[in-house]
Amino acid sequence: LPKRDYLTFCCFTGLAFSDVATLSGENLVQDNLGDWWIRKGRVKLEHRRKASSISNIPLLPVPLAILEKYREHPICVKKGCCLPVMCNQKMNSYLKEIADFCGIKKNLTTHVARHTFGTTVTLANNVPLQDVSVMLGHASTRMTQHYARVMNSSLKEAMNNVKERLEW
C-alpha cells in the first residue's frame, strides 16, 4: 500500500494503525440508503489498558475509492484484509523521513492521521463531539476531547453568530 494511500485513508476514517491492519470485508456494511460504513470493534491493547469499543464510521468518497483500488490486490485476497499495510514501525520511519525532508518539526507518526480526522476532517466541519467520539470508537466524549483542539476560526465563527443574534 503506498504510504500516501494509507495516510489519506487514516485521515478520512480516523482508524488507528492496528484497526486498519485488521480491517476486513466483514467490517464494511452498506446501509439501506446505499451508503457504506466501517463498523469495527477496536483492537484491545492489554498493555495500554485500552478498552474494547466499536467504531462506526460513514465512509466518504476518498476512503471508498482507496478501498476499491485495493479490493483485488493479491495480499488482500490472500489475507482477507481490505488494505495491504506494512508494519507500523516502517510506516513511521517513512513519515519521519518525509517530515525531515519538508522541514516539519512535529513528530509525524501514523497516529497523527487519527488526530487529523478528529480535528480537521470532523470537528472543523462542525461534526458534533459526540458523533466524532462514536466514529473514533471512544468510550466517552472525555476521551475525544483529547483530540479536539479548539481552533480560533471556529471560536470566531461561534462568537460572530452570537453577535448577530444579540444585535438590535
What are these regions (language model features)?
Residues 1-17, 21, 125:
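Basic, Lys/Arg- and aromatic-enriched nucleic-acid-binding interface segment
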Residues 33-38, 120, 131, 144:
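Catalytic cores of nucleotide-enabled group-transfer and carboxylate-activating enzymes in metabolic
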Residues 61, 73-77, 162-168:
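C-terminal secondary-structure termini that scaffold catalytic or DNA-interacting sites
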Residues 42-44, 88, 123, 136-161:
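Catalytic-site neighborhood detector that most strongly recognizes the C-terminal catalytic loop/helix
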Residues 22-68:
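Conserved tyrosine-mediated DNA breakage-rejoining catalytic core shared by Y-recombinases
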Residues 13, 74-81, 85, 93-134:
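Short, basic (Lys/Arg/His-rich) helix/loop patches that form interaction surfaces
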